[in-house]
Amino acid sequence: MKPALLLRWAHRYRGSLALIGGISLLSSLATLAMPWLAAQLAAGIAGDAGIDLGRTLALLCTALVAQTAFDILVAIMSADAAGRILAGLRGEAYEHVQSLPVSYHESHRTGDLMSLVSWEVQNLSTFLSATLAQLPGTVMTAGGAVVLLFLIDPGLGLVVPLLVVPVFFIGMRLLGRRLRKLGAAVREAEADVFQFADSDLSMVPAIKAYAVEDYHRLRYAAAIERARRLKLTQARITAFIGPVTMLLAALTAIAVLVAGGAPGIGAGWRSPAELFAFLFYTALLTRPVGSLAGLYGQYQVTRGTMRRLEEVFSAPSEPGYAATGTATRATGAIALAGVDFAYPGRPAVLCGLDLAVAAGEIVALTGANGVGKSTIINLLLRFHEPDAGRITLDGTDITTIDVKAYRRQFGYVPQRPLLLGGTIRENIVFGMEDAAPEQIERAARLAQAWDFISALPEGLATRIGDDGVRLSGGQRQRIALARALLRDPPIYIFDEATSMYDLEGEAAFVEDCVKVLAGRTVILITHRPASLALANRIIELTPTGWGNLKDKP
């Protein structure tokens, strides 16, 4: 896998990452200076008269303070960069997920997408800011230590890195694949946790009604435990990599130094200070080697996140987003010509469907379950694309119209009202936030919602809970209808929009809406007599086609 996403985001924040990397390099310079100064100080204390102890001590303290200051700056700037990268990643991921077609959301678990935009993007932002940006300083510390070892004693200075570095690569080779597999398992387990929580919280009434709280609690607990165990295993390995690599490198260096006491090896020492410096740089070399090992482990974990993000970002947005055609207010003439459609892995629902709805016509679709009523609605709203055939609006192929401009021609009320967790007003003005108070009241009255809204202590400011949980089914439908009526589009689509109304409320709605719907194209999916009475034409869909049950001028 090519880390294209990693490179793209690194390039986007190259200024911040380069600055962090530059300060990290300055910190590594201070780090490299300290062993030499410490060795000079130790030699001076041991009696080397050629060393100025005061000057050496001052330089050592300066290097320590500089390293501390640089490390603090790196930590603060890394946290700031991580926050900005995380915000950008989440925003871009959310925007792209929103642009994906409904068919994508139907074939992917909500928990996977929630895990992606919340937890997985955090891994990538942390890797970019806290790990990758500090790589230059770590590499410089390791490289500088190797160069200085060679300058002090070319013999041992060459042998130490030749034995220490292979320890790093062997360890990484052995653990890299294991970390990648663990990373994938952790992501799947976290997605399960999100999915179970989302599903169970939306099913609380059913879970309580069937008294299955214990089963769902245990299922969720099992998902949490699986995720915990996998993350613990992953943490153990990543925690193991750096220190153990450092230990093995240190033991290797010690073995080389011991062997260096043999005749002919290490005989070039010129002073005690150089001996101390060689020992200090040998010890220093093990730290960046361990850090590089830890960075490699983090990269293996992050690779899985990058692969998952690339899969989502590579999924194409809805085709209509690329269309350039604009749409003024439509007259509402709709035609489906030779339309075929089948859901993935299922038999065809529509085969060669030809259906025309005139502008201003009210058409009711009836028929048994599964004959394609809702499928027609999904195709009209471009939630799905037909496998064959053509759909036009006022004679224009809808695939040539910008999908957002096209959908603004519709007022859609689904069978299951889709409501925000905010106030009644926020739900009614959804997409029409600048609506005037009198417009909101009129739409609510037409939907037979104003009486119950005005009876509430906070009226339109009443908070209705997630998905309108604090309202009855009929009240939720009334708010959804008010939302569509406020939009005042040329075309309405009502999918069992009054199925939760009482008979009196439905009759009042039909009576009030006769004038409002005049001149509008309306497509109804309903079996209720009061709503059917609105229709100019009633069409019965069957597995083999359709026929008019009622046709009046």
Q: What do the PLM-derived regions correspond to, one by one?
A:
Residues 83, 91-115, 119-121, 195-219, ...:
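Short intracellular "coupling" helices and adjacent cytoplasmic loop segments at the cytosolic face
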Residues 12-15, 102-106, 119-128, 132, ...:
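An intracellular "coupling" helix at the cytosolic face of ABC transporter transmembrane type-1 domains
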